[in-house]
A protein has these predicted regions:
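Compositionally biased, charge-rich terminal segments
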Residues: 170-181
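Nucleotide-sugar donor-binding/catalytic module of glycosyltransferases
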Residues: 1-172
């Protein structure tokens, strides 16, 4: 990483149990490494500029997994101003999952997607040959192909700062689409 991440993590080292800092083949390769190294039963992936809106999010997600036989959980996401994270730029209200919505291009917000580790072990990791659509392919694989049981939590689970790899600009989106085709 070239964005001061290692310096920040070094500053917080007393709160970190495990750290991998090495070359990888893109964001999805890094995510796969994290999944393989994880020791918990539930995996959520939070990107560099994303954060949970409060300290209760993980407890709420854990409760849904504990109280049900679901394989996956997701919720809503808000895009926030990079300089003022209280200022909401866009609210991504996911709504309840159904196959027809997915068939028509609906996508749940990937940073809000929590999955049992056993699901990754059974159905595989992210496709590293896709540059920006591996998260979408994973959603399609798990929910459409394998029809896993997913539960929607109708709350904001993640805040995403504007300016990241996929939402920096319209041209970034076009470039990403071209890379994945």
């Amino acid at each position: 990483s070239t964005d001061w991440t290692i310096d920040i993590l070094d500053y917080c080292k007393d709160k970190i149990d495990y750290l991998i800092s090495e070359e990888d083949n893109g964001i999805y390769d890094a995510m796969n490494k994290g999944i393989l190294a994880s020791t918990g039963d539930i995996i959520g992936i939070l990107n560099a500029d994303d954060f949970y809106p409060d300290n209760e999010v993980l407890s709420k997600v854990a409760k849904v997994f504990k109280d049900s036989d679901c394989d996956c959980v997701y919720g809503d996401l808000v895009y926030v101003n990079k300089g003022d994270t209280k200022k909401i730029v866009r609210y991504w209200k996911s709504g309840k999952f159904n196959i027809s919505k997915l068939n028509n291009g609906w996508m749940l917000p990937h940073p809000t997607f929590f999955v049992r580790k056993s699901v990754y072990e059974k159905y595989g990791l992210y496709s590293t040959d896709l540059k920006s659509a591996a998260d979408y392919e994973m959603i399609l694989r798990l929910l459409l192909k394998y029809k896993l049981n997913v539960i929607y939590i109708p709350e904001i689970l993640v805040k995403m700062r504007m300016g990241g790899k996929s939402n920096r600009s319209f041209w970034n989106r076009i470039k990403a689409n071209h890379e994945d085709s």
